[in-house]
Amino acid sequence: MSRIILSLDAENADLKARVAFLEQQLFGPKSEKMTAIDPTQATLDLGDLTDIPAAANDDVAPVAEGPKQERRSPSRNIGRLPRHLPRYEELIEPESKICPCCSFELHCVGTDVSEALDIVPAVVRVKQTIRPSYACRAGESVIVQAPASARVMGESNVAPMRLAFCLAHARRKFVDVVKLTGSSEAGR
C-alpha cells in the first residue's frame, strides 16, 4: 500500500512539474531567457576553466598599424525628392543687408536650400526655399540670414498645401464610408 502511495506521489510530482513547465511556456515571458530553457541545462559541469594556459604569440607576425580611417559623423538623409518633378523657388531675404557693426553692405557667403513636396490640385511640384547668408567684408564675425519659414510637421518635407490635400482626401473617404454605413442601416 505504501509503495502505491509513493508511486502516486512521484507521478503527481512529475505531473505538477510538467504543468508548471507548460504554464511557463504559455503564460511566461516570450523571450529566450534562462527561465524558458530546460532547467537541467543550466547545471552543466564545465570544470575549472581558470587553469587553461594563455596562448603564446611568439610565432605571430606583428601587425603593421596603417593610417586610421576617420569616421565621418552620421548625416541625416530623409530622402531626396524626385528630380523629374517641376520645381519653383521662393527666395527669402533678410530684412536688412546692412552690417549692424560697421554699416557697410553685406555680401552673400552661402545659401541654405530646403525642399518640400507641394501640391496644387492636379499639379505636384517641389517648393525650394532659398535663404542666402550675408557677411560683411570688413568684419568677418557677422553673418546675417533670414529665419527659416515654419514647417507644418517638424522636420518633414511636406508643404502646407500637400498636408491640406491629404487631410481633405482622408476626410472625403471617411464621409463616403459614413454615408454608405448610414444608408445600409437605414434599409434595415
Swiss-Prot record:
Keyword GTP-binding: no
Organism name: Sinorhizobium fredii (strain NBRC 101917 / NGR234)
Region annotated Disordered, chain positions: 57-80
Family listed: Belongs to the transposase 25 family.
Pfam families documented for this protein: LZ_Tnp_IS66, zf-IS66
Keywords, comma-separated and alphabetical: Plasmid
Highest taxon of the lineage: Bacteria
Protein name: Uncharacterized protein y4aQ
Keyword Metal-binding annotated: no
InterPro entries, alphabetized: Transposase-related, Transposase_TnpC_homeodom, Znf_dom_IS66
Segment forming the signal sequence: none
Entry-linked PANTHER family: BLL1576 PROTEIN
